[in-house]
Amino acid sequence: MHDRLSRRAARLIGRAAPLLSPGRQAVLSLSATLLSAAALAQPAARAYAIPAGSLESVLTRYALESQLMLSYSAADVAGRRSGGLTGSHDAASALRQILAGTGMRASLQPNGGYLLRVAAGADDAQTLPSVTVTGDGAETAWGPVAGFVAKRSATATKTDTPLHETPQSVSVVPRAQVVAQAADSLDQALAYTAGVMPLDGGALRNISTGFTVRGFNITGSAPLYLNGTKLPMNSMSGAMEPYNYERIEVLKGPASILYGQAAPGGIINLVSKRPTAEPLREMEVKYGTWNTRQLAMDFGGPLTEDGNVGYRLTGLARDADTMVRHINNDRQSLSGSLEWQLSGATRLTLLGGWSRTDNPYDVGKPREGTLLPNPNGAISRKVFLGEPGFDRFVVQGGHLGYLLEHKINDDWQVRQNLLGYNHRANSNNLYMMTSSVDAANPARVERLAVSRDDTDKGIALDNQLLGKLRHGRFEHTLLFGVDASRSSLTRDQAVGLNAVPIDVYDPVYGSTPTLDPARRSISRARQVGFYAQDQIKFDGRWIGLFGGRYDRARTEEAPDDGRQDSHAFSPRAGLMYLFDNGLAPYYSFTKSFQPTSGMDFGGTPFKPTTGTQHEIGLKYEPPGVDAAITLALYDITQRNVVTSDLANPGFSVQTGEVRSRGAELEGRASLNHNLDVVAAFTLTNARTTKSTRGDEGARPASVPRSMASLWLDYKLAALPGLSTAAGVRYVGRQESDGVTVPSYTVLDAALRYRLQNWEFALNVKNLTNKRYIAACPYACYYGDERNVMLTARVNW
C-alpha cells in the first residue's frame, strides 16, 4: 500500500474517532501508521508566522503549512493553548516551540510523522483516542491550499472531490502561488496555467477579463463564476482582484452539465476567502513601476467565544499608472463574509463584495508599426491613441449572497446558494476605425467615438441535494440540483463618426468628438436547469462520473423585439482507474450549449451552439511526494456556428463549425518542503472546419499553437527565511485575419525574505525588458515592459 491510502485512513480516523471506543480508536490509529509504506522526508528549516491560539488550531495550521503528519489525542489537546510559532524552524524545533508550556511532547515515528502526547502519561498513550492531522487532510475544496499543490476541488463536480479522482482536467491556482508571483490581475494569476490565454495579452487587465481556453473564447455568456455561481453577463463589468480569493480554478472543456449555458472551452471559477477559526490579521503594502502604490488588508476570526460566528474582511486600494501614457490602473475593492453555525447541522455563510474602477481603455495600436512594417518606424509602446479629456471607464458595483448548508443525517445534506449583483459602468472611448493606418498617410489612424452607460444586474439561485450510498463494493456520491437565474443588461450607447484622426508617432490631443443621440438597448436572459450526477467508486479503484442536465433558456433583445427560447440536454460520462503507484488514467465525454442571438433571413431564431468534447488523460500523484501531474488529450467540436448567408447578403446561417484538438501537460510539486515547481505545456490546433466565408482552416485570434511555462520557487536552507524564484513563459505564434503574431519568451524573477511575522518581496516581470506583441485580436497590444514590485507584508 502507498501513502495515498494512509492519508485516506488518517482522514477516516479523524472523522470516526469521536464515535468509537478508546480501544477501537487505538487499533485504528495503529492501522493508519502501518498503512504508510513510504517514509516521509523531514521538512527542512523554513519560516513560520503562526499566531498564538488553542493548541489544536496551532497544530492544524502547522500541519497545513509543513505537510507533516501529526497524531495526537483529541482529549489531550482540548483546553490547552499554544504561544504559536514564529521564525525559521525544522520539524523538531517547531514542535518544541508549539508545545512549550503545554505539558505535551512530540516523538518521531517510523513513518516520518510525530506522535504528540502528555509527558506524564506516555506509558498509557496506546489507550488514548487518536486524531491524525496532515496537510492533505486539512484541505477542503473551498478552503486554503498548503503551498502550490491543491488536492481537492468542487468546480468539476460541485462536491468536495479529490482532483486525483476527477476524470476531467482542472487547474487550481492557490493563494500561495498568487502571492509568490505578485499577481495583481487574473491574467497574471493564470499566466502559468496550461491552455489559458488572455484575449488581449493582458493589456486590458485594468478594466475587464477575457480569456480563451482550449482554443475557444469563454468570455461570452459566462465570463466568470464566483463560488460556482455565474457572475454578470457583461464582460466589461470590471476586472477581478486575485487578492480577494482563496483559489482560482479552471475547468477545461464543456461544463454545461452543472452550470448550464457556457462556451465549450471551459469556465473560470473564483473561490472566496472564508472566515477563519483563529484570528487572522494581515496588512500588505506594495510600491512599484508605473507609480504603483497599493494597500491591502485581510482580517478574520471568530466573533463569539464558542466560535459559532466568524468573519473575514478583505480590502484593497490601488493608485497606479500603466505602461501606456494617460491610462491608469486605479481600483478599490472590499470583500467580506460572515459564517454562522446555527446548529450542529446547519451553517449559513453570507458573502458580499464591492469594487470601483476608474481607468481609461487602451484601444491598442495599428498593425503597421507594431506587427507589420511602417515607413515611419516602430510605434512606441507608451503612446495613447485616445483623448485624455474624453476617454474614461468607470465601473462600480457589488454582489451579495449566501451559502446555506443543512445536514439531514450523516449521509444526506441540502445546500442552497444565492448570488445577486448590480454593476454600473460608464465609458467614453475613441477606437480605431480599422486595425490599419491610413493608406494615404501611414502615420495616421482614423477614429470612432463611442459612449456607453451600462447597468448590469441579476440574481442566481442553486438548490442542491447531496447524499452518499454504499452497497457491497460500490460507493455513490449523489447530487441532484435545480438552479435558476435572471439577468439584464441595459445599455445607452452613442456613436460619433467624425472624430479627428490622430498621428500615432506625434499625437496631438484636445479634440472633443460629437456624438449622435444615444440609443437604448436592453438584453434580458433567464435560465432554469435540472441536473443529476452520480460519482461512483468500485473497490476503491474504479471511478465513474455520470450525469445529465436539462436547461430551458430565454433571451430577449429590445428594441428589436428579438426573443429566443432554447432548451438543451447536456450529458457527461467519465471513467478512471486508480493504480497503487499513483497513476490514474481516465476518459471523459462532455457536452455544452450556448444560446446565440439573432435570426436568419426567414426570421427563424438561431439555435444554440453546441460543443462536444472527448478527453483522455493520465493523472499522477507520486506516493510520498506532494506533487500532482496531469496529461490531457482532447477533441472539441463546436457546431451551429454563425457564418455568412451568401444567398442573402447581410444575413447569417448556422452552418459553421469549429474544431479544437490539443494536448496539455501540467505539473505541480512541493519537494523537500523547500522547492515549489509549477510547469505547463500546451499544444492547441484550433481551426474553422466549416464556413461559407472561405476561411476553412483559419485559426481563431488569441490562440497560440503552443505555450510553455516553468516557475521554480526555492527556500534557501543555508539562509533561513530567504527565498528566490524564477519563471519563464513561452507563447507560440498566433494568427489573426491572415497575419501572424510572432512567438515570444518572457522571464520573471522574485526574491523574498521572511523575518518573524514580516515578509518582504521583490518581484520583477519581463526581466530582460523584451519588446513583443502580446496579442492582436483586432488592434495590436504590446506586452508589458519590465516592471518591478516591492511588497511588505505583516501578519499578527
Pin down the residues of each PLM region.
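Periplasmic plug
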Residues: P129-G135, E165, S169-R175, A180, ...
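Outer-membrane beta-barrel translocator/receptor signature
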Residues: Y243-E246, I257-G336, L342-R347, G398, ...
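Structural signature of Gram-negative outer-membrane beta-barrels, strongest in the C-terminal barrel
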Residues: Q341, D456, E475-L479, D483-S487, ...
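Membrane-embedded beta-barrel scaffold of Gram-negative outer-membrane proteins
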Residues: E405-N409, Q413-L419, H423-Y431, P585, ...
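Conserved C-terminal beta-signal and adjacent last beta-strands/turns
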Residues: L478, A701-W796
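Gram-negative outer-membrane beta-barrel transporters
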Residues: D635, Q654-D737, T791-N795
